[in-house]
């Protein structure tokens, strides 16, 4: 959901190979695409720079590369703003990719999902967090996929707190990082918040 916090091994490898002339001309063209298509994490190399006020900028990263029988296969992970037209995004990206001699074998997209920050339920859920922690929280929209998109009238609601310092080195401890962990204190607060949230939502449904 936040590729800008790291570096793409695929892009670094492609750049090193191209700059040092380690491949013949044909193979070098394959890796030139991998380098030029992802100069940043915001789709500029794919001509897909989308952004909206609610969900921010589109992100795109070549997340995995396979080479089998001289055929290169690249998986591109894109997180689009909720207002973006996925068919339009596919059309633009396809044109750029085919211009490099590649082709799209599969394009799968999930429509964006969003609940208004000012909606009654979201406001009350936020209030409960603030009551338990004694500090201000602001709801936000992100590109990560959650189970919320699979359930009607649901929102992602969990104890991921960026302000908490964990007693481990930088680059460790967060989601999908080495030593991924959560503070025990967070789990206890989360249990209290979830109980209060369930009771609150139950009252709203009555």
Task: Describe the predicted segments one by one.
Residues 1-84:
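Midchain, well-structured core segments that form catalytic/ion-binding scaffolds
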Residues 2-6, 26, 108-116, 180-183:
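Short histidine-centered catalytic/ligand-binding loop motif
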Residues 4-15, 57, 84, 88, ...:
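Conserved active-site and cofactor/substrate-binding residues in soluble primary-metabolism enzymes
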Residues 5-9, 93, 171-173:
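Short intrinsically disordered coil segments
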Residues 12-23, 92-100, 120, 124-132, ...:
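Generic non-transmembrane alpha-helical segments
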Residues 67, 72-144:
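Substrate-recognition/cap regions that form aromatic- and gly/pro-loop-enriched pockets
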Residues 68, 127-128, 135-204:
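Zn-dependent metallopeptidase/amidohydrolase metal-coordination segment
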């Amino acid at each position: 959901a936040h590729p800008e916090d790291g570096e793409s091994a695929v892009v670094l490898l492609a750049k090193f190979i191209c700059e040092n002339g380690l491949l013949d001309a044909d193979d070098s063209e394959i890796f030139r695409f991998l380098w030029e298509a992802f100069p940043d994490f915001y789709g500029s190399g794919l001509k897909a720079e989308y952004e909206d006020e609610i969900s921010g900028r589109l992100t795109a990263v070549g997340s995995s590369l396979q080479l089998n029988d001289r055929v290169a296969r690249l998986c591109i992970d894109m997180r689009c703003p909720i207002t973006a037209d996925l068919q339009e995004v596919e059309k633009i990206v396809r044109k750029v990719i085919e211009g490099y001699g590649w082709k799209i074998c599969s394009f799968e997209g999930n429509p964006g999902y969003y609940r208004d920050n000012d909606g009654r339920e979201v406001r009350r859920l936020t209030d409960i967090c603030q009551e338990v922690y004694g500090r201000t929280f602001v709801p936000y929209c992100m590109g990560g996929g959650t189970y919320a998109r699979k359930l009607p009238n649901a929102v992602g609601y969990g104890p991921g707190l960026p302000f908490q310092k964990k007693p481990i080195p930088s680059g460790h401890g967060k989601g999908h990082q080495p030593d991924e962990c959560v503070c025990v204190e967070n789990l206890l607060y989360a249990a209290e918040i979830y109980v209060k949230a369930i009771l609150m939502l139950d009252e709203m449904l009555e």
